[in-house]
Amino acid sequence: MQVVYEDNHIIIVSKRSGEIVQGDKTGDEPLSETVKQYIKEKYHKPGNVFLGVVHRLDRPVSGLVVFAKTSKALSRLNNMFRDGEVHKTYWAIVKNMPMEPEATLTHWIVRNEKQNKSYAYDHEVKNSKKAILKYKVIGHTDHYTLLEVNLMTGRHHQIRCQLAKMGCPIKGDLKYGSPRSNADGSISLLSHRVEFVHPVSKETIVAEAPLPDDNLWRAIAP
């Protein structure tokens, strides 16, 4: 875990691939507990430390996660995420080059909870939810392409599912059609940047994640 930004009300950390944001049935220690311990030790706080989980990243994804350190910040950030006032930018290394260097993708996504997987359709189907994202090619090597992705909606596995539907699965993402896994079990999707108005001070906050420690990321990033 790396702290990217911190003040009295919020803390933004860079999550490593493989970490879970919040506790689940695996029993593995979540990032939220690691951050609580960091706050407890840094500020010598006795007893329980307040930390609000505002959003999540899939376990194999790396990058920025925003937490609230006060109940006031938690309430306001929850509303801001719900209302699309937190602008998140993702970087994805994908197989193949998209047909268009820049485009908006619109699909209808159906989530299969038993498989923990989503399926994208070009038209509305039963139990589907509309999913929209924008992408832009910002780098490439001989075999891979780096896309900058902005979500217009927030669906289950949306980026992974929609890019795979386009014929450009994320490197290492076996679930969505990548031919091989990454050696460390990650998928090459990074929550790269967040920008929002601070819920208390009203200042504009911009944070960027460090690149994963990987030769391909270093070679392909602009």
Predicted regions and their residues:
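RNA pseudouridine synthases
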Residues: 1-222
